[in-house]
Amino acid sequence: MALNLQDKQAIVAEVNEAAKGALSAVVADSRGVTVEKMTELRKSAREAGVTMRVVRNTLLRRAVEGTEFECLTDTFTGPTLIAFSHEHPGAAARLFTEFAKANKEFELKGAAFEGKVQDVEFLATLPTYEEAIARLMGTMKEAAAGKLVRTLAALRDKLQEAA
């Protein structure tokens, strides 16, 4: 079905709005994936706070113009599925990576974060805010415990020398 000018403008505006509020974007090719599997992916995307859309490449190029995802225009070839992460930069990458492992037909084309093309695997392994805080706290606790052990060992050695 051919789209009229107003429909095209609405699509460009919608995708542009999603791009402006997004932290990262991931581009994929979903040829060969069944409708049932794509429906599952869309449901998972909604739960993860990810906006997903299949858009014509020419409209997508116009939609990302002037945004930090303009660097992805080289990946807009063939059927293009784009996902924008709104809550966590790695959400879309993690979702697509897991889906690609289960569905060999699903091909990841690229990802962008902070205006630069990034490896999808890199984005998928980014810790969430809570995970990063937990790692930081673990490191701080570990450092404090290590310092205590070294202090006690030094005190023990000093007492042994005095005796």
Swiss-Prot record:
One of its GO terms (cellular component) is large ribosomal subunit. It comes from the Bacteria. It holds the Pfam family Ribosomal_L10. Keywords: Ribonucleoprotein, Ribosomal protein, RNA-binding, rRNA-binding. The keyword Ribonucleoprotein applies. GO terms for molecular function: large ribosomal subunit rRNA binding; structural constituent of ribosome. InterPro entries: Ribosomal_uL10 (IPR001790), Ribosomal_uL10-like_sf (IPR043141), Ribosomal_uL10_bac (IPR022973), Ribosomal_uL10_bac_type (IPR047865), Ribosomal_uL10_CS_bac (IPR002363). One of its GO terms (biological process) is translation. Belongs to the universal ribosomal protein uL10 family. PANTHER family: 39S RIBOSOMAL PROTEIN L10, MITOCHONDRIAL. Part of the ribosomal stalk of the 50S ribosomal subunit. The N-terminus interacts with L11 and the large rRNA to form the base of the stalk. The C-terminus forms an elongated spine to which L12 dimers bind in a sequential fashion forming a multimeric L10(L12)X complex. Forms part of the ribosomal stalk, playing a central role in the interaction of the ribosome with GTP-bound translation factors. This is Large ribosomal subunit protein uL10. The gene is rplJ.
